[in-house]
């Protein structure tokens, strides 16, 4: 899997923080997010899922993720945005790869990306969350095109 190393700016994000098995919580979170975006006429700059844990080290019921939209830096939450978080997604150096997800199998491209990145001795993972940006509406198109972001730092830092 090909990837690039990019400097990514901090993003302002709004949405829902979830805990539990990602294959259940993330789709439910996007349903909630879509309702909130529609009800409050939010104009998202991008749709993202943010992942805070390693599923090979954390039990499924404890996995943390956010389903969010990128919003302008001066965005404020509308009244009655129950359960919605507004926070920053840290910027910095990230390895970035594009993938097509079919049959809702998001795990396979992520595993391929991590495997490829671990082979690169120049970089190691940094202590920031991973995230993916959705480039299309997979419910409509039948597949998802995503950009995957893994935080990295130069080895030895």
Curated annotation (Swiss-Prot):
Q: What family does the entry list?
A: Belongs to the DNA gyrase inhibitor family.
- SUPFAM superfamilies xref list: Probable bacterial effector-binding domain
An example Pfam family from this entry, by short name, is GyrI-like
Enumerate the GO terms in the molecular function aspect: DNA topoisomerase type II (double strand cut, ATP-hydrolyzing) inhibitor activity
Q: Record's HAMAP family?
A: DNA_gyrase_inhibitor (MF_01896)
Q: What is this protein called?
A: DNA gyrase inhibitor
| Compartment list | Cytoplasm
Q: Which organism is it from?
A: Cronobacter sakazakii (strain ATCC BAA-894) (Enterobacter sakazakii)
Write the record's keywords in alphabetical order, separated by commas.
Cytoplasm, Stress response
What Gene3D superfamilies does the record tag this protein with? Regulatory factor, effector binding domain (3.20.80.10)
| A Gene Ontology cellular-component term | cytoplasm
